[in-house]
Regions:
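Long, charged low-complexity intrinsically disordered regions
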Residues: 3-217
């Protein structure tokens, strides 16, 4: 059996920039469980974090911020080799109808033949995800939404949520430094407690609750 990981002893103090919900004043990263959950110690007790849900929340807010500020080009990552993605006729039509919204998220994308798009750049936040899967997810969610609502802000939120959702089943291997960075980025979110789909990002276990369960005090 491999030795247990050594906790990162540094305590990370969370700065107050006025934008974050500040779930805690400081944290100490402890470990990542075999099932992938992150464990940290805070001033409130022990916190268990779902890193996939955390990445969804971070990505969602950053995409919306970029779209609102019209800074999509500055937050895009240019592909070394442009990628072509062929979709079903229905999915192609859905992306085509929402092309400006997709571009606001950071995609440099254009039509490239029958039912095909050419992608020259993608949002920095999704550099590790397969582009075809992300576009298919966006198309699916656009189809599910139908025309029940309209408006630029609503479309931005829908597409950003679809892109972020692509992390749900993705591999997310984290080093200790990567885990700490993820927690720091989560702390800067406006709504760090739930992912865009409403699922919990973290579970708190207070020191008082731990003492009660262990019949201490």
């Amino acid at each position: 059996m491999p030795p247990a990981p050594t906790p990162v002893e540094t305590e990370f103090v969370i700065s107050d920039d006025g934008n974050s919900a500040k779930p805690w004043q400081w944290f100490k990263y402890l470990a990542q469980s075999q099932s992938g959950y992150l464990l940290i110690e805070t001033d409130a007790g022990i916190v268990t974090i779902n890193p996939h849900a955390a990445r969804e929340r971070i990505t969602y807010e950053r995409l919306l911020d970029s779209a609102s500020a019209r800074e999509s080009l500055s937050t895009s990552q240019t592909l070394l080799i442009p990628e072509t993605v062929k979709l079903s006729p229905i999915d192609f039509a859905r992306i085509q109808a929402a092309l400006e919204t997709v571009r606001r998220m950071g995609f440099q994308i254009e039509e490239f033949g029958q039912d095909t798009f050419k992608i020259d750049a993608i949002p920095q936040q999704i550099a590790t995800l397969p582009v075809a899967k992300v576009l298919s997810t966006i198309a699916h969610d656009l189809g599910e939404s139908g025309s029940r609502r309209n408006g630029e802000r609503w479309r931005d939120e829908l597409v950003a949520k679809s892109i972020a959702k692509s992390f749900a089943g993705a591999s997310l291997a984290l080093t200790e430094a990567g885990a700490v960075q993820l927690v720091e980025e989560l702390c800067a979110c406006r709504m760090p407690y739930v992912c865009p789909r409403g699922k919990p990002v973290m579970i708190f276990t207070s020191t008082r609750e731990l003492d009660r369960k262990f019949a201490r005090g």
